[in-house]
């Protein structure tokens, strides 16, 4: 059996991004438990940071009500590229931008920087599809959410 051809799913060349290419930032403190046996932050933690950075920003801006809002965002796609290790104890700056704004979906890109660094240690994205909280069917982005997200493009 031949190995799968990943040439269609893996970019030919991926490079770290500059801090200046992100629109908003949020500080995240690493925890002792984030490190793995190899002495750096485990890959799963990066995905948690992406989610935390975006959702905390949306909540702070008053455009996402996780407890009672009629619209919620569900993650349908995610990916991460790693360029340099991060480890406890470190403060991470998570840069956020919107790469694509659709009718009911958003592609967020998050760059993770060692505090004060100009280039990303990791860069990832995830796509939220916004759905009705009850029936889980896609709905148009609420106007206040869309207005805020446009500032991140």
Q: What are the functions of these language-model segments?
A:
Residues 2-24, 86-88, 98-153:
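HotDog/MaoC-like acyl-thioester-processing domains
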Residues 2-60:
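Catalytic strand-loop segment that frames the active site of acyl-thioester-processing enzymes
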Residues 27-31, 81, 127:
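Generic structural detector for well-ordered beta-strands
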Residues 34, 40-43, 76-77, 84, ...:
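Generic structural "secondary-structure junction" signal
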Residues 46-49, 74, 109, 127:
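Residue-level recognition of specific faces of alpha-helices
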